[in-house]
From Swiss-Prot:
Compartment(s): Virion; Host nucleus; Host early endosome; Host Golgi apparatus
PTM comment: Highly phosphorylated.
Summary of the function given for this chain in its UniProt record: Minor protein of the capsid that localizes along the inner surface of the virion, within the central cavities beneath the L1 pentamers. Plays a role in capsid stabilization through interaction with the major capsid protein L1. Once the virion enters the host cell, L2 escorts the genomic DNA into the nucleus by promoting escape from the endosomal compartments and traffic through the host Golgi network.
Name this protein carries in UniProt: Minor capsid protein L2
GO biological process, one term: symbiont entry into host cell
Disulfide bonding pattern of the chain: C22-C28
Family the UniProt entry places it in: Belongs to the papillomaviridae L2 protein family.
Any one Gene Ontology cellular component term annotated for this protein: viral capsid
Keywords, in A-Z order: Capsid protein, Cytoplasmic inwards viral transport, Disulfide bond, DNA-binding, Host endosome, Host Golgi apparatus, Host nucleus, Host-virus interaction, Late protein, Microtubular inwards viral transport, Phosphoprotein, Viral penetration into host nucleus, Virion, Virus entry into host cell
GO molecular function: DNA binding; structural molecule activity
Phosphoprotein among keywords: yes
Intervals of motif Nuclear localization signal: 1-13, 447-455
Subunit structure comment from the entry: Interacts with major capsid protein L1. Interacts with E2; this interaction inhibits E2 transcriptional activity but not the DNA replication function E2. Interacts with host GADD45GIP1. Interacts with host HSPA8; this interaction is required for L2 nuclear translocation. Interacts with host importins KPNB2 and KPNB3. Forms a complex with importin alpha2-beta1 heterodimers via interaction with the importin alpha2 adapter. Interacts with host DYNLT1; this interaction is essential for virus intracellular transport during entry.
Length: 466
């Protein structure tokens, strides 16, 4: 009969058991040695990665399951706290028991005696002597005395300071006598206070404390945007401003115009001046300077509207009266016209635009050239060539602009060679510059000159003639 083969697989030994037997023989599988010696890929990642990342105290990868430094805390409960043991309060001294027959009032004066805290230190008394003994001898030899002087100086830096002990505390209902030494020695130097020079003149004394009552004058705010500006023409505003606000009887009322004036509700009255209607307060005057004038100003408050609660609403008005004007300093200078009128006609050869050309030689009969818009006349000498002289060029402006005389420009020239036969020049040898008025540029100057393209002959083998 054929027996059934067992299909159960035999378990292999663990890696630790295999490593102990196969390490010496060198027959260990490839996965046993790295696992036991911790040289797997995962171990190498943890080894080199721990150099840059630190997870100390968190319990990651340790397998201990402690939950880190603080441990695991259940969500539903709180960690228990240790309560301190309560210590009963007891008196510091023992209390004697009191019997039922003992009196309730204890007399402390009878039992208490005189408490001697301490006896004072004895004061040494100098010894009493009867004097010096005088002995007389017949020896005439002079006596030699050996005298040595010793001086001692105490350094307070290295001397211990004297400490004054506090008195001993004591409490009793009888007689109390305290005795302690209250005399102490010190090593510091006592310097008497001296009186410096005392000045009796209080006018020259300067103090850093500000003088009360002297302050910087505040700005009046007369020309703010919220203030209405009203100019007063009536000169009564200077002496009796109350007459412009309400009717008064001068026989019974005397008002100082330099003080603030307050009025009751004058809405049912008509003011003599309509500019002062509904005025309830007119403040003190002020003299100011505004735009070369001396100005007399007063601020006033109006009561235009009154609410049921008693609040008043009104504008703030600045009343001013210009007393006099201030003339600007300096003498006035009469201005002279610089140019002629556009309707003035100009004459030819009136001295405008004269250009002088100085020569180094003298001629007998110089030639004169007069150039005009209509004709041009030229004359030359029969002996010498063309000699430039004063040339007058009247320039006409197309926009009737006044023409002013320009400066004289001297031009120097080299001496001209004299030929054996007369030579009439075709063009003048002197450049004439004209300044003044307006001009038109010649159309040929509008075209820009075309720059010649330069070609480099560095790589050529031929020479170019200059």
């Amino acid at each position: 009969m054929r027996s059934k083969r067992s299909t159960k697989r035999t378990k292999r030994a663990s890696a630790t058991q295999l490593y102990q037997t196969c390490k010496a023989a060198g027959t260990c599988p490839s996965d046993v040695i790295p696992k036991i010696e911790h040289t797997t890929i995962a171990d190498q990642i943890l080894r080199y990665g721990s150099m840059g990342v630190f997870f100390g105290g968190l319990g990651i990868g340790s397998g201990s399951g402690t939950g880190g430094r603080t441990g695991y805390v259940p969500l539903s409960t709180r960690p228990s706290t240790v309560s301190e043991a309560s210590i009963p309060i007891r008196p510091p001294v023992s209390i004697d028991p009191v019997g039922p027959l003992d009196p309730s009032i204890v007399s402390l004066v009878e039992e208490s005696g005189i408490v001697d805290v301490g006896a004072p230190a004895p004061i040494p008394h100098p010894p009493t002597t009867s004097g010096f003994d005088i002995a007389t001898t017949a020896d005439t030899t002079p006596a030699i005395l050996d005298v040595t002087s010793v001086s001692t100086h105490e350094n307070p830096t290295f001397t211990d300071p004297s400490v004054l002990q506090p008195p001993t505390p004591a409490e009793t209902s009888g007689h109390l006598l305290l005795s302690s030494s209250s005399i102490s020695t010190h090593n510091y130097e006592e310097i008497p206070m001296d009186t410096f020079i005392v000045s009796t003149n209080n006018e020259n004394i300067t103090s850093s404390t500000p003088i009360p009552g002297v302050r910087r004058p505040a700005r009046l705010g007369l020309y703010s945007k919220a203030t209405q500006q009203v100019k007063v023409i009536d000169p009564t505003f200077l002496s009796a401003p109350k007459q412009l606000i309400t009717y008064e009887n001068p026989a019974y009322e005397t008002v100082n115009a330099e003080e603030s004036l307050y009025f009751s509700n004058t809405s049912h009255n008509i003011a003599p001046d309509p500019d002062f209607l509904d005025i309830i307060a007119l403040h003190r005057p002020a003299l100011t300077s505004r735009r070369n004038t001396v100005r007399y100003s007063r601020l006033g408050n109006k009561q235009t509207l009154r609410t049921r609660s008693g609040a008043t609403i009104g504008a703030r008005v600045h009343y001013y009266y210009d007393i006099s004007s201030i003339n600007p300093a300096g003498e006035s200078i009469e201005m002279q016209p610089l140019g002629a009128s556009a309707t003035t006609t100009s004459t030819l050869n009136d001295g405008l635009y004269d250009i002088y050309a100085d020569t180094d030689f003298t001629v007998d009969t110089p030639a004169t050239h007069n150039v005009s818009p209509s004709t041009a006349v030229q004359s030359t000498s029969a002996v010498s060539a063309y000699v430039p002289t004063n040339t007058t060029v009247p320039l006409s402006t197309g926009f009737d602009i006044p023409i002013f005389s320009g400066p004289d420009v001297p031009i120097e020239h080299a001496p001209t060679q004299v030929f054996p036969f007369p030579l009439a020049p075709t063009t003048p040898q002197v450049s004439i510059f004209v300044d003044g008025g307006d001009f038109y540029l010649h159309p040929s100057y509008y075209m820009l000159k075309r720059r010649r393209k330069r070609v480099s002959y560095f790589f050529t083998d031929v020479s170019v003639a200059a």
